[in-house]
A protein has these predicted regions:
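Pyridoxal 5′-phosphate
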Residues: 1-201
Length: 206
């Protein structure tokens, strides 16, 4: 079979993924539920994974890493936790429904929303984000890269603008994590989400 949809969901997983799933089913206990060996081993593995992810994204510490069922839940949690009625949010037309739908729902409850369009080259400049910021802006929510246009946003520049204006910066890295560098501290990112579905060796072998 010739598979052309890797940009949506990676088809072939590394052999280590299948082995890890098998090992987990056969050997791991319930993390946090007991002091027996299998449970303690599960807890250690979870924490070690947090350490690896924190190192990959240069986060503020492994205790800040949260495991959720998918990127949609992670993005919804960040959006619902950081954005309240009366706030203004800047986002883009490049976003996945996991960003746009909760933001449109927030709009119905009193959140003001600015959706930045693409230019003729399929890009959105960092200046466009800066120009969209208002006195009541609370957050910028954007993707890092699009698997539709193949373009990536300059998170450094957008993050600098967020820092200057004291804004929350929420990033959907589902298309870029493990492929493009992401430095949460240097980019002033408050929350970043990713999914393993589109990752190859980099994230699947953590």
């Amino acid at each position: 079979m010739i598979y052309f949809d890797n940009a949506a969901t990676t088809l072939k997983k590394p052999d280590g993924v299948a082995q890890a799933v098998s090992d987990a089913i056969m050997n791991l206990g319930n993390a946090g539920r007991g002091a027996y060996d299998a449970s303690l081993h599960s807890m250690r593995m979870a924490y070690e994974t947090r350490e690896l992810l924190n190192e990959l994204f240069n986060g503020e510490g492994p205790e800040q890493i949260a495991f959720m069922s998918n990127a949609t839940e992670a993005l919804n949690t960040a959006i619902n936790g950081m954005i309240q009625p009366g706030d203004h949010v800047v986002t883009t037309v490049m976003e996945h429904n996991s960003v746009l739908r909760p933001l449109y729902l927030k709009e119905q409850t009193g959140v003001a929303l600015t959706v930045l369009p693409l230019d003729e080259n399929g890009l959105i400049s960092s200046e466009a984000f800066e120009e969209a910021i208002r006195p009541d802006t609370e957050a910028v929510v954007c993707t890092h890269a699009s698997n539709v246009t193949g373009t990536a946003l300059n998170l450094y520049r957008i993050g600098e603008a967020c820092k200057r204006h004291g804004l929350h910066f929420i990033v959907d890295a589902s298309q870029s994590a493990g492929i493009l560098p992401i430095d949460m501290q240097a980019m002033n990112i408050d929350a970043v989400s990713y999914t393993h579905l589109r990752a190859h060796e980099t994230l699947m072998n953590l």
